[in-house]
Amino acid sequence: MEDSGKTFGSEEEETNYWRDLAMTYKQRAENTQEELREFQEGSREYEAELETQLQQAETRNRDLLSENNRLRMELESVKEKFEMQHSEGYRQISALEDDLAHTKAIKDQLQKYIRELEQANDDLERAKRATIMSLEDFEQRLNQAIERNAFLESELDEKENLLESVQRLKDEARDLRQELAVQQKQDKPRTPMPSSGETKRTDMAVQATGSAPSTPITHQGSSSGLNTPETFRCGLGSPSSGTPLTPAARISALNIVGDLLRKVGALESKLASCKNFMYDQSPSRKSGPALGRGTKNRDGIDRRPGSTAVGDKGSGKRLEFAKPSSQLSSPALPSTQGVVKLLL
């Protein structure tokens, strides 16, 4: 201590010194006690406050623990739900993948089916075009058949005209034979009779002219020859019958026309030879007896009313046969003009 080595001048001074020092220490002790008391009060208050805070903290801790437990339970439930959702999502994803694969397969099948439909459509369009072309060809052939029918009807009309001319020539031949017989009876003393061979040939020509054609046409299902225009028309078939004319029937019809033309030409030549023979035997004969046939001119040609001479009639008939037909003709058949010219 610093005061232990201090020296005093007197005892009173030392007593005062120690009294002052004691008072100082006493004051310090009182101050320290006061501070201790204040500190204790403050510590008690602080302790109470800490206890209060501790209680609050414990309460809060309990609340937090309960909340933690609740959150853990919720977490477990959420985990379970997540696992369930995950498994459900996986199943849905698997199902969607299967559906996607199935949809892709269906899409491929549909694309294949579309390609097949397009190919079938192309085939149908080609078949349609082929059908249209076949229909056009059928219409063309139908028109050709109609033209052939019209041409054959014109041929039938010409055949009827030929039959009428043959009948007229037969009548004229019969009249000429009768006239020749009468003139032979009148000129018997000075005109020799024609030979039996010539008469026989004339009769045979006339009979051949009136006989049936050498190439008959038979209708389907019929075995008899066609000798008249009606049977010939039935044999060829009308345009509305629907049966097309065969090439053999066309050739037969042309053969009939050719036979008729040849027979008409033979008959005309026979008539001309008979007239020449008759006029050579009697160059200066008078007009014939009144048999209702008109008069003859100085050349010996019969000029009956409403009729022409046999030679003129034959020439006119030849010219009439040589005229082209005004009816429609088929490209597959030769024209009547060419046939008549070839036959004449």
From Swiss-Prot:
Its main location: cytoplasm. Phosphorylated in mitosis. Phosphorylation at Thr-246 is essential for the G2/M transition. It is found in: Cytoplasm, Cytoskeleton; Cytoplasm, Cytoskeleton, Microtubule organizing center, Centrosome; Cytoplasm, Cytoskeleton, Spindle; Chromosome, Centromere, Kinetochore. One of its GO terms (cellular component) is cytoplasmic vesicle membrane. Expressed in brain, heart, kidney, liver, lung, skeletal muscle, spleen and testis. Residues 30-65, 181-243, 279-337 are annotated as: Disordered. Residues 88-156 are annotated as: Interaction with PAFAH1B1. Keywords: Cell cycle, Cell division, Centromere, Chromosome, Coiled coil, Cytoplasm, Cytoplasmic vesicle, Cytoskeleton, Developmental protein, Differentiation, Kinetochore, Lipoprotein, Membrane, Microtubule, Mitosis, Neurogenesis, Palmitate, Phosphoprotein. A lipid is attached at C274 (S-palmitoyl cysteine). Residues 167-290 are annotated as: Interaction with CENPF. Residues 208-230 have a biased composition (Polar residues). Pfam families: NUDE_C (PF04880). InterPro entries: NUDE (IPR033494), NUDE_dom (IPR006964). The modification Phosphoserine is found at S211, S282. Homodimer. Interacts with CNTRL, LIS1, dynein, SLMAP and TCP1. Interacts with CENPF, dynactin, tubulin gamma, PAFAH1B1, PCM1 and PCNT. Interacts with ZNF365. Interacts with GTP-bound RAB9A and RAB9B; the interaction leads to RAB9-dynein motor tethering. Interacts (via C-terminus) with MCRS1 (via C-terminus); phosphorylation of NDE1 inhibits the interaction. This is Nuclear distribution protein nudE homolog 1. It comes from Rattus norvegicus (Rat). The gene is Nde1.
